[in-house]
């Protein structure tokens, strides 16, 4: 257990990418740029041990995957989709009327978007729902999913989620090579305008490498959660909230903050007991051993200071009055209030996207939303009257900046 002062002194959660990957990723990207589909098939064989004749799956395969779902799985995916869709429709930015002002903004959906869906050890239909639904609501014209190939075939639930969300193209390719393909295009894969979705360090570094040639959502690090709890919290539930993050990755970070030392000690005992038989024990044990923190705060203000310093991907408040933290906890990817709003609900069915900022980037950026799949530009349409009211000031500023043709462009209209 750490005091708030000890924690704040030691805390530095800004993970840097492994610089040794730069050369590997740059070589992969260059190879895909030059060799196209051939490079993708070679990398599928090299990295995933899968020989791929066709990179693109047929739309009929997506529909078949959906049709073959059992009722419980279909209902779960559909409910998740509907909740995400309704939430995103509610927060979608509304077009301003050109009748109300001479200066306003217009929004347009991005033309083509690529979504990375992780594969390998686990499959994530929820990632499809939490990204492609947003693109669909935004009105993106062409939604492309890339996901690593499997010898047994792509996870059927992932394909079904692609069908539900109206994905236009699904390609069997993963890793840095898929990011390169989406950026540069190949014989089969069209280049996109923006790439979103989580992945491993190779994917993260590839997104960083191609940024500027294509838009990206973020460069994601390991998952993280910070919880503020008091004596009213259900400590068994809190332990599983901690395990739920820790089971993702040995590097996953979990923080529990309380003003009550006894509560933290009790929680620690429960966590250690449950660790003996918890599923995915190997991953969870490593995460708990290296990236789990119990932090004792002196008061609510100090607890919030710690939370805002961590700026976690997920923040959970499980106290008697969680609502009192709404305005005090500012820098988090998503804020979960109360016993019945565990972070895991946000992973699957709450409505907001689970693609959230990590590594303290919540201090300056936001979780993925429908509006990230749209562009905006300002429109300026002045009347002669308004022009005459502002022209002299504009002309004068141009003059003091010695931009004389700017000045003349205004002057000739007066």
Curated annotation (Swiss-Prot):
One of its GO terms (molecular function) is histidinol dehydrogenase activity. Zn(2+) binds at residues 245, 248, 347, 406. Keywords: Amino-acid biosynthesis, Histidine biosynthesis, Metal-binding, NAD, Oxidoreductase, Zinc. InterPro entries: Ald_DH/histidinol_DH (IPR016161), Histidinol_DH_CS (IPR001692), Histidinol_DH_monofunct (IPR022695), Hstdl_DH (IPR012131). Its EC number is 1.1.1.23. Its cofactor is Zn(2+). The active site is at residues 313-314. Pathway: Amino-acid biosynthesis; L-histidine biosynthesis; L-histidine from 5-phospho-alpha-D-ribose 1-diphosphate: step 9/9. One of its GO terms (cellular component) is cytosol. Binds 1 zinc ion per subunit. Substrate binds at residues 223, 245, 248, 314, 347, 401, 406. The keyword Iron does not apply. NAD(+) binds at residues 116, 177, 200. It is an enzyme of class 1 (oxidoreductase). GO terms for biological process: L-histidine biosynthetic process. It comes from the Bacteria. It catalyses: L-histidinol + 2 NAD(+) + H2O = L-histidine + 2 NADH + 3 H(+). The keyword Coiled coil does not apply. Belongs to the histidinol dehydrogenase family. Catalyzes the sequential NAD-dependent oxidations of L-histidinol to L-histidinaldehyde and then to L-histidine. This is Histidinol dehydrogenase.
């Amino acid at each position: 257990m750490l005091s708030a002062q000890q924690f704040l002194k030691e805390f530095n959660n800004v993970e840097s990418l492994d610089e040794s990957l730069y050369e590997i990723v740059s070589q992969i990207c260059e190879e895909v740029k030059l060799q196209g589909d051939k490079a993708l098939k070679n990398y599928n064989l090299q990295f995933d041990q899968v020989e791929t004749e066709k990179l693109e799956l047929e739309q009929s395969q997506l529909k078949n995957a959906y049709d073959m779902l059992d009722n419980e799985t279909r209902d779960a995916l559909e409910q998740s989709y509907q909740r995400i869709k309704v939430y995103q429709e509610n927060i979608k930015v509304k077009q301003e009327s050109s009748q109300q002002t001479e200066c306003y903004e217009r929004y347009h959906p991005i033309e083509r978007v690529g979504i990375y869906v992780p594969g390998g050890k686990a499959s994530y239909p929820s990632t499809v729902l939490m990204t492609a639904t947003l693109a669909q609501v935004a009105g993106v014209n062409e939604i492309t999913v890339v996901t690593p190939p499997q010898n047994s075939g792509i996870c059927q639930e992932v394909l079904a989620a692609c069908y539900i969300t109206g994905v236009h193209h699904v390609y069997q390719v993963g890793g840095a090579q898929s990011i390169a393909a989406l950026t540069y295009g190949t014989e089969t894969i069209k280049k996109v305008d923006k790439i979103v979705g989580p992945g491993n360090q190779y994917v993260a570094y590839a997104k960083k490498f191609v940024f500027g040639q294509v838009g990206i959502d973020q460069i994601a690090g390991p998952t993280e959660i910070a919880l503020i709890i008091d004596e009213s919290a259900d400590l068994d539930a809190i332990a599983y909230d901690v395990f739920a993050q820790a089971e993702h990755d040995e590097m996953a970070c979990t923080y529990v903050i309380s003003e009550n030392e006894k509560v933290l000690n009790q929680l620690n005992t429960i966590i250690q007991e449950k660790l003996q038989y918890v599923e995915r024990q190997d991953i969870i044990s490593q995460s708990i051993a290296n990236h789990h923190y119990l932090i004792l705060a002196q008061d609510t203000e100090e607890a919030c200071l710690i939370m805002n310093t961590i700026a976690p991907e997920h923040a959970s408040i499980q106290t008697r009055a969680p609502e009192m933290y709404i305005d005090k906890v500012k820098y988090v990817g998503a804020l979960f209030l109360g016993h019945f709003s565990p972070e895991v609900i946000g992973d699957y069915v709450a409505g907001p996207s689970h693609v959230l900022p990590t590594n303290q980037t919540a201090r300056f950026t936001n979780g993925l939303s429908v509006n990230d799949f749209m562009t905006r530009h300002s429109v300026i349409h002045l009347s002669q009257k308004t022009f005459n009211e502002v022209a002299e000031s504009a002309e004068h500023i141009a003059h003091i900046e010695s931009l004389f043709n700017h000045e003349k462009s205004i002057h000739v209209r007066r």
